[in-house]
């Protein structure tokens, strides 16, 4: 059965970057835009999976989601 890994892009308001949370051990990504984040996942995640989860066979997939929390302007 094909494996799907979850990768969340969490927006850090202070640092102004998306940071990763993932079920892929060792995957650490930061990027200034969501598009850059996705490109880094596509580039780096297959290598990290191969290195840290050698029993996982291709093909595998990445479910990439973006999360951003906004404060109300009326606080």
Where in this protein do the model-derived segments appear?
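Short, charged, surface-exposed hinge/linker loops at domain edges
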Residues: 1-8, 28, 35-75
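A generic "functional-site adjacency" signal
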Residues: 14, 30-31
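Short aromatic-glycine-(Arg/Gly/Cys) micro-motifs in beta-strand/loop hairpins
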Residues: 6, 10-24
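Surface loops and adjacent helix of pleckstrin homology
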Residues: 23, 32-34
């Amino acid at each position: 059965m094909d494996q799907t890994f979850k990768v969340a892009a969490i927006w850090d308001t202070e640092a102004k970057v998306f940071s990763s949370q993932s079920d892929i051990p060792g995957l650490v990504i930061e990027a200034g835009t969501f598009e850059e984040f996705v490109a880094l996942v596509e580039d780096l995640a297959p290598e990290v999976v191969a290195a840290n989860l050698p029993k996982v066979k291709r093909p595998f997939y990445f479910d990439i989601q973006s999360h951003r929390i906004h404060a109300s302007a009326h606080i």
